[in-house]
């Protein structure tokens, strides 16, 4: 592991015991995903799910179990097939809004099943009684890529 990544992981591990952000890794390890796509649950009562990942039944079931019927919204960082296909499945099952940006029409590498109920823009804010999520548009990796800053946790989900 690169020194910078090791430091980042160590910092995340130190915060994990008191953090309201829980990381869950899908079993889709590979060249582009490393050990697998990371999904995140933010909060303890009013939970936000970020990047539900691919449609892998065991992963989606695990997210539902850990979300404990408290997931109120699903956000995606971008619509590559390893990040967003689980959104529709879980959104339908939980009856919660899907949030993110539209798929670029000219990009065939995108997950076309993702249709946000709410389109997020740079500068948008999601507030709950536990935390705030600040939306940052970061095109590059994907034209519809968003990052989510959780100031209370000093954490940016990319």
Locate each region found by the language model.
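N-terminal amphipathic/basic-hydrophobic helices that include classical n-h-c signal peptides
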Residues: 1-11
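Active-site HxH/HxHxD metal-binding segment of metal-dependent hydrolases
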Residues: 6, 30-35, 54-134, 153-154
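A detector of low-complexity, intrinsically disordered, Ser/Thr/Gly/Pro/Ala-rich segments
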Residues: 9-13, 42, 123
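Conserved beta-strand hairpin/beta-sheet module of binuclear metal-dependent hydrolase folds
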Residues: 15-66, 147-158
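Short beta-strand His + acidic residue motifs that chelate non-heme Fe in jelly-roll/DSBH
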Residues: 135, 146
